[in-house]
Amino acid sequence: MKNKSIWNLKNTKKLFYKPFFDLMFKAQKIHRKNFSSNKIQISTLLSIKTGLCPEDCKYCSQSSRYKTGLVSEKLIKIEKVINAAKKAKKSGVTRFCMGAAWKNPKDKDIPLLEEMIKSVKKLGLETCMTLGMLNDYQANRLHNAGLDYYNHNLDTSKEFYKKIITTRKYEDRISTIQNVRNAGIKVCSGGILGLGESDKDRIKLLIQLANLPKPPESVPINMLVRIKGTPMEKNKDVDAFDFIRIIALARIMMPKSRIRLSAGRENMNEQTQALCFMAGVNSIFYGCKLLTTTNSSSKRDALLFKKLNMKMEKIKNKEKYFNKKQNSDLYENKNYYNAVC
């Protein structure tokens, strides 16, 4: 059967406001039941088309509406993608993500995107793309080319969303996720903390994700990177313990999903990252850049993994979590484990 909509504001708030260590213990217990506690999946993200986006997302350096000093770049050639993917594979990356600053791709761009997917797949890497909104036709084309994952974040709660973005409706994002899922592509969808939202908004974001007909296989949790020139350049920092609580909550609510520590990680100290791993993070972006923002250095990450005795997952191990049979019934099989409170 499909995952039931068991999460509501009452039971989720009760869980969120548990004593910190009780919440962490519960998240770690669920994490260990579903994943190896000392292994982490590594992804990297390449911007294949940079800047001049018509959207007005108030946090984004790529919006054409804000003067951020970003140098725009047209859709790059496939040779650049292949070279970047080869370097990523050598560094231990198992998933190669490609992002384009579009509201939505045009049909004329699809053939080149298909070639990018096929070329990266030939290297033995998983593929992910984030291109904006997709219609059914485009989603099916990308699926047929072999795309494994599609990223389309909800960003925040439905109620707070209109204060962040006006050029795309919340329902448009849900529709794209449905199109991706219907096409047979696995879903990557999460949000951003630090937009000025409340605890209630953060909780509602996770409720929305967890109560989808099938929760995302991958859930990136971002901490706002304040970009000069955007309306959010002076937003307040997110408290580290508040951030970790959301990680733990995401792990409990979506026990079979990859929880990815994404943007903002370069500003976190080792102790905060370690607590995020303990709370349920089992995936990170690896490399010096996330689209247009800086990321934690590979050397720094390697040192942290060594201190924590954590190992990067190898490509040969990916079938354990990502074979098609398992993904097709991720939340429906008898081993599915969840705990509301």
UniProtKB/Swiss-Prot annotation:
Residues that hold [2Fe-2S] cluster according to the record: C97, C128, C188, R260
InterPro entries, per database record: Aldolase_TIM, BATS_dom, Biotin_synth/BioAB, Biotin_synthase, Elp3/MiaA/NifB-like_rSAM, rSAM
Manner of cofactor binding, per the entry note: Binds 1 [4Fe-4S] cluster. The cluster is coordinated with 3 cysteines and an exchangeable S-adenosyl-L-methionine.
Assigned keywords, A-Z: 2Fe-2S, 4Fe-4S, Biotin biosynthesis, Iron, Iron-sulfur, Metal-binding, S-adenosyl-L-methionine, Transferase
Pfam families xrefs: BATS, Radical_SAM
Coiled-coil residue spans: none
Cofactors that this protein relies on: [4Fe-4S] cluster; [2Fe-2S] cluster
Biochemical pathway: Cofactor biosynthesis; biotin biosynthesis; biotin from 7,8-diaminononanoate: step 2/2
EC number per UniProt: 2.8.1.6
Cross-referenced PROSITE patterns: RADICAL_SAM
Gene Ontology molecular function, alphabetical: 2 iron, 2 sulfur cluster binding; 4 iron, 4 sulfur cluster binding; biotin synthase activity; iron ion binding
Reactions it catalyzes: (4R,5S)-dethiobiotin + (sulfur carrier)-SH + 2 reduced [2Fe-2S]-[ferredoxin] + 2 S-adenosyl-L-methionine = (sulfur carrier)-H + biotin + 2 5'-deoxyadenosine + 2 L-methionine + 2 oxidized [2Fe-2S]-[ferredoxin]
Residue intervals of the Radical SAM core domain: 38-262
Binding-site residues, [4Fe-4S] cluster: C53, C57, C60
Disulfide-bonded cysteines: none
UniProt KW Isomerase keyword: no
Entries under CDD domains matching the protein: Radical_SAM
One GO BP annotation of this record: biotin biosynthetic process
Family matches, as Gene3D superfamilies: Aldolase class I
Described purpose of this protein according to its UniProt entry: Catalyzes the conversion of dethiobiotin (DTB) to biotin by the insertion of a sulfur atom into dethiobiotin via a radical-based mechanism.
Quaternary state and interactors: Homodimer.
Similarity comment: Belongs to the radical SAM superfamily. Biotin synthase family.
UniProt-recorded name of the protein: Biotin synthase
Lineage: Bacteria, Pseudomonadati, Pseudomonadota, Gammaproteobacteria, Enterobacterales
